[in-house]
């Protein structure tokens, strides 16, 4: 993720914590690093699990250090190949904590599909990542960017 997109990208993903690890000069270098790291950690969001609640906070600097140790030889090879300007370790960054406005998480995640059912009703329980959480289901609002949607509020 580009530096100017943090923490926006983390918020979009529904992350409750984030920590930059590397600064690179181009997308190719980022991809090479990601290929090494994903051998040890999942790189996909499990959206249903994410919408059921918040994970326990982690000590991200410690997780980073453990991950870097597991990938040390591969990362050293990349650093030797592309130099300090191409791949720079960010070992002094602070963990970003993100709180989402959610009154109640769903026990079971049911996703709305406006193409199949154009009317959805419910009481807004919260927002996490790209999702609106209602008492009747969830909707990935980004999926419907070009749609004309009407909201109504009843007191």
Q: What is the role of each PLM region?
A:
Residues 3-82, 151, 155:
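Aromatic/basic micro-patches that form nucleic-acid/chromatin recognition or nuclease catalytic surfaces
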Residues 118-126:
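Structural detector for short beta-strands of small beta-barrel domains
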Residues 130-134:
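Short aromatic-glycine-enriched beta-strand elements
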Residues 77-102:
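Divalent-metal-activated hydrolytic enzyme cores
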Residues 1-3, 122:
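GIY-YIG nuclease signature motif recognition
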Residues 37, 91-93, 127:
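Domain-scale terminal segments
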Residues 96-116:
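Short boundary/loop segments of OB/S1/cold-shock single-stranded nucleic-acid-binding domains
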Residues 139-155:
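Structured surface patches comprising rigid loops and adjacent beta-strands/short helices at the edges
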């Amino acid at each position: 993720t580009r530096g100017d997109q943090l923490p926006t990208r983390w918020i979009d993903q529904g992350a409750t914590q984030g920590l930059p690890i590397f600064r690179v000069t181009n997308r190719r270098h980022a991809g090479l690093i990601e290929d090494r790291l994903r051998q040890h950690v999942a790189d996909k969001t499990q959206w249903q699990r994410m919408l059921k609640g918040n994970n326990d906070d982690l000590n991200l600097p410690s997780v980073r250090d453990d991950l870097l140790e597991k990938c040390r030889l591969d990362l050293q090879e990349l650093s030797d190949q592309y130099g300090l300007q191409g791949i720079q370790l960010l070992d002094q960054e602070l963990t970003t904590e993100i709180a989402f406005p959610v009154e109640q998480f769903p026990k079971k995640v049911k996703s709305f599909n406006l193409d199949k059912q154009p009317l959805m009703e419910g009481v807004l329980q919260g927002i996490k990542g790209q999702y609106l959480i209602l008492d009747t289901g969830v909707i990935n609002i980004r999926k419907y960017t070009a749609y004309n949607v009407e909201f109504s509020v009843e007191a």
